[in-house]
């Protein structure tokens, strides 16, 4: 059964249409986790901690890819909804070309700033060499990494989410196989982990680039375009929430690492690394659903179909609530197994990780609502509200909690901070959904 953006969506259609995006994001997260598993088990906790220290800086550099993908896909979907296909294709081409140019500049700047940033983020003389070796190789694939994040969204707009899933599977399997070979067989350590990731990201970014360069049967193809500053500005505005989410999360991760180095040392950073890797997989379900459903919302917004917007919002929130309950139960029950994948070689570290993860996992009861609400407003081309939700969720609520709560609860306060932040983000999301209901007509 073919599903198009203009359809009326039942639960079955909604899940079928978003399923490739959900699986794609979960697999992407799992493939990223493989680096951590191999490094932790074959290289050691210090190398594992070093990757967690430098990763926020690398994610900040790549955040523009998430912004362009989410903001640009919303704009292109809305333009398709108005019936202007030529304009939609021109915007798509412009965004890809600009992203490649910006990616080159960021790669050069990242290589220059890598070592100073590692020191600033808390790397000592033991961890610094690991950070630099890992980061330099990852930066070589920064442009493909950005393109991968952009094309994940645009393949949905092109009504080819299955292709995006296949590319993600190919990229991820490459990462897993090369991780095993480079780290477990050749014993290349963090260099092997970085090389495996860089190669897999290149596959994930370059294959869809070639797909859109050559003639294809989708709605999109790269071609001639012209500079359109209003489209660039609208893309940045629409994608500001995703950009701020990635920037803010990276800054918050830096703060977590700093607090944990102060209160628990490198073992604390390793524990947080385990929690983050597992949390990425769980959050990927919400992100994948939001990413997969956003073009539908954008299309019906552009077409002025308010009844379908109401239908999409209500069904989505019911699905998100179901996901949240299931993930929380899985996290609480499976904490020993999930932690053991990374640190079973150290029982003290394992016990510490299980305790921390069970505290942290309560946040999954709230996490999905704010992620979807932010994406929903991005799809409506209301980038301001989307950015406010994302910025407050991480940069204000979580930062404030991780600074304040440890004064009263010690290390436990660090794990509880995410729960407080996610709950406040849900309240803020509900406020904006109620306030904007009349404007967009989804009540």
Language-model regions, residue ranges each:
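Transmembrane alpha-helix boundary and packing residues in multipass membrane permease domains
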Residues: 21, 25, 37, 41, ...
């Amino acid at each position: 059964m073919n599903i198009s953006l203009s359809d009326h969506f039942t639960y079955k259609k909604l899940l079928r249409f978003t399923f490739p995006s959900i699986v794609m994001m979960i697999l992407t997260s799992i493939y990223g986790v493989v680096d951590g598993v191999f490094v932790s088990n074959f290289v050691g906790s210090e190398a594992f901690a070093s990757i967690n220290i430098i990763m926020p800086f690398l994610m900040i550099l790549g955040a523009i890819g998430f912004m362009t993908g989410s903001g640009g896909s919303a704009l292109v979907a809305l333009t398709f909804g108005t019936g202007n296909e030529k304009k939609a294709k021109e915007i798509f081409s412009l965004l890809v070309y600009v992203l490649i140019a910006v990616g080159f500049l960021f790669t050069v700047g990242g290589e220059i700033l890598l070592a100073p940033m590692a020191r600033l983020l808390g790397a000592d003389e033991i961890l610094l060499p690991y950070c630099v070796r890992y980061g330099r190789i990852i930066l070589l694939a920064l442009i493909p990494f950005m393109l991968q994040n952009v094309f994940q969204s645009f393949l949905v707009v092109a009504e080819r989410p299955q292709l995006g899933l296949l590319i993600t599977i190919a990229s991820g399997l490459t990462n897993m196989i090369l991780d095993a070979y480079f780290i477990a067989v050749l014993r290349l350590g963090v260099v092997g982990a970085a090389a495996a990731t860089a190669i897999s990201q290149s596959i994930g970014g370059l294959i869809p680039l070639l797909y859109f360069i050559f003639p294809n049967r989708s709605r999109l193809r790269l071609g001639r375009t012209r500079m359109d500053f209003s489209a660039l500005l609208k893309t940045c505005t629409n994608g500001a929430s995703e950009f701020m989410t990635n920037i803010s999360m990276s800054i918050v991760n830096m703060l977590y690492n700093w607090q944990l180095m102060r209160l628990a040392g490198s073992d604390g950073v390793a524990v947080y690394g385990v929690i983050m890797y597992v949390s990425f997989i769980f959050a990927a379900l919400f992100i994948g659903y939001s990413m997969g459903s956003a073009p539908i919302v954008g299309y019906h917004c552009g077409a002025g179909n308010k009844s379908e917007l109401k239908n999409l919002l209500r069904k989505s929130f019911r699905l998100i609530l179901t996901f949240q309950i299931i993930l929380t139960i899985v996290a609480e029950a499976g904490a020993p197994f999930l932690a053991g994948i990374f640190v079973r070689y150290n029982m003290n570290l394992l016990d510490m990780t299980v305790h921390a993860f069970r505290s942290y996992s309560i946040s999954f009861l709230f996490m999905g609502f704010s992620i979807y609400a932010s994406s929903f407003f991005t799809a409506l081309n209301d980038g301001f509200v989307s950015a406010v939700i994302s910025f407050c969720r991480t940069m204000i609520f979580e930062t404030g909690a991780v600074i304040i709560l440890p004064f009263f609860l010690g290390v436990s306060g660090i794990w509880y901070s995410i729960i407080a932040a996610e709950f406040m983000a849900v309240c803020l999301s509900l406020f904006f959904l109620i306030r904007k209901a009349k404007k967009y007509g989804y009540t």
